[in-house]
Design a protein with these regions (language model features):
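A generic structural signal for secondary-structure junctions
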Residues: 41, 111-112, 125
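Conserved small/polar residues in nucleotide/adenosyl-binding loops
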Residues: 119-125
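Substrate-recognition/cap helix-loop segment adjacent to the acidic, metal-dependent catalytic center
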Residues: 83-87, 102-118
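Short, well-ordered beta-to-alpha junction loops that form the rim of enzyme active sites
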Residues: 96-101
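Conserved non-catalytic scaffold segment of RNase H-like nuclease domains
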Residues: 1, 5-95
């Protein structure tokens, strides 16, 4: 799973994109979930530091956020449904990815149902 956010502080920043991939024990891709861009208000986007604005502008994500109609709740629901289709039982697989600790803080704050599906172990990539 990978999240994109408007910054690094879950108290003031928000999730703007969720992408999920399910792998087997050898990290071979089993299923690719939807790449979900979440609409956020101009007020939420105004809290981004310039480095984040520049990054999301270059990637095209900022325009995609503004044009998206998907709510965070709907994105969370779709992601959870995808995970449950492919994961045998809750908390049975680790979260793998880059900046996992940061993603977990945002999941705790905004999408605790997804967080409760994850095992406490993790595999950090670089």
């Amino acid at each position: 799973m990978d999240l994109e956010m408007t910054g690094l502080d879950p108290a003031k920043n928000v999730i703007v994109e969720i992408a999920t991939i399910i792998t087997d024990d050898n990290l071979e891709i089993v299923a690719e979930g939807p790449d979900l861009v979440v609409h956020q208000s101009e007020e939420a986007l105004a809290l981004m530091d310039q480095v984040v604005v520049d990054m999301h502008t270059r990637s095209g994500l900022l325009d995609a956020i503004r044009s998206s109609t998907l709510t965070l709740e709907d994105a969370g629901r779709q992601t959870l449904e995808f995970i449950k289709q492919h994961v045998p039982s809750p908390r049975s697989v680790p979260l793998c990815g880059n900046s996992i600790g940061m993603d977990r803080r945002f999941l705790d704050a905004y999408l605790p149902d997804i967080r409760s599906e994850e095992h406490t172990s993790e595999l950090q990539s670089h």
